[in-house]
Design a protein with these regions (language model features):
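Enzyme catalytic cores with a strong preference for nitrogen-chemistry domains
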Residues: 1-183
Length: 183
């Protein structure tokens, strides 16, 4: 129990919110804090046909028994989270493919980027490209990037682009290290 004291947990969750009387489903991440509080981030860059069906909401919602199914809604907040004495942002999957999303989060104060992902639906080749996108974001924004993949490739990348840890494809592993915020 003492080993976990002061530990933060970041994971993915499906999240439902009722906004202005409309049920909205989000692909979200949650950060659980040591004091029992939490915060969430809603994925901004949704993948067509995987997380939403284009134009689906426009016609299916006219049949009111289907008012809350069909797809995720995109998030709109570029959040940073305080973790002890530094600020972090959490990206979900292909949020990391958008330089604008990462740049905005860093502009908002993020000193480190966490990427949580599930690359199971993209075959054997794309997880390698996805990891290289994480590396590109680290170099572009000069911040460390930690990618945690339940399928795909996990790793720790320094702002220089140096990979200090990289798992094998789809490897279940635990790796811990102190990540410097500035290389």
């Amino acid at each position: 129990q003492d080993k976990l004291s002061g530990t933060y947990l970041i994971t993915g969750i499906p999240e439902r919110k009722n906004i202005d009387g409309i049920n909205q489903n989000f692909n979200s991440s949650i950060i659980l804090k040591p004091d029992g509080s939490f915060d969430t981030y809603q994925k901004i860059f949704l993948v067509p046909f995987a997380e939403y069906v284009p134009f689906f909401k426009n016609w299916i919602t006219k049949m009111n028994q289907f008012d809350d199914i069909g797809s995720f809604y995109p998030g709109s907040e570029y959040k940073t989270f305080n973790i002890d004495d530094f600020k972090a942002s959490i990206l979900i999957c292909y949020d990391s493919s958008s330089p604008q999303i990462v740049e905005t989060m860093v502009d908002n104060g993020a000193e480190i980027i966490f990427i949580i992902t599930n690359d199971s639906y993209v075959g054997q080749f794309m997880p390698y490209q996805h990891f290289q996108l994480a590396r590109l974001r680290a170099v572009e924004q000069r911040v460390p990037v930690i990618q945690s993949a339940n399928t795909g490739i996990s790793g720790i990348i320094l702002p220089s682009g140096k990979i200090v840890y990289r798992s094998k494809l789809n490897e279940r592993t635990v790796f811990t290290m102190e990540v410097p915020l500035y290389e």
